[in-house]
């Protein structure tokens, strides 16, 4: 249901190594269609998904994903990629709805692997300590 929380083990993942000052961690995310209880005119199916790794979005096996459902997740994804305070709602809430009220499509944002990124690999502005 909407508002169910992520499992504790996904929330409390700890980094294994000490990060350099120019490094940071992001979760890889999978956004999966969890339920559809209305008329989805974009032919989405339960189980349809996309992945976010770093700043790159991909869909398995060249599959399609509804633009309108996708756009409803975009503002949340950068915050879901990061570790937040345990009481922050971004740590407990994982469901997003399609903006089409007749579709009644619910997606779930799952955290996958935790990856380490280097500042200079993802920004044209060089890291200065």
Tell where the protein language model's regions lie, with residue ranges:
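Structural beta-strand/beta-sheet cores of well-ordered domains, especially the beta-sheet scaffolds
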Residues: 27-29, 48, 105
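Acidic, aromatic-enriched beta-alpha/helix-loop junctions
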Residues: 48-88
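Short alpha-helix capping/helix-loop boundary micro-motifs
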Residues: 34-39
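N-terminal amphipathic/basic-hydrophobic helices that include classical n-h-c signal peptides
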Residues: 1-12
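Short, compact, well-ordered microdomains
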Residues: 84-128
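Short, basic/aromatic beta-hairpin or loop at an interaction surface
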Residues: 18-31
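Helix-coil modules at protein/domain termini and other flexible surface or pore-lining loops
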Residues: 22-25, 55, 96-100
């Amino acid at each position: 249901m909407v508002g169910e929380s992520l499992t504790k083990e996904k929330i409390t993942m700890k980094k294994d190594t000490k990060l350099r000052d120019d490094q940071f961690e992001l979760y890889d995310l999978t956004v999966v269609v969890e339920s559809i209880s209305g008329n989805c005119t974009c032919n989405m199916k339960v189980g349809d998904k996309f992945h976010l790794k770093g700043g790159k979005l991909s869909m398995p096996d060249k599959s399609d994903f509804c633009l309108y459902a996708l756009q409803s997740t975009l503002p949340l994804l950068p915050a879901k990629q990061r570790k937040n305070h345990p009481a922050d709602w971004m740590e407990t809430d994982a469901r997003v709805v399609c903006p089409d009220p007749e579709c009644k499509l619910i997606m779930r944002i799952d955290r996958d692997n935790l990856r380490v990124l280097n500042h200079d690999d993802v920004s044209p502005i060089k890291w200065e300590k």
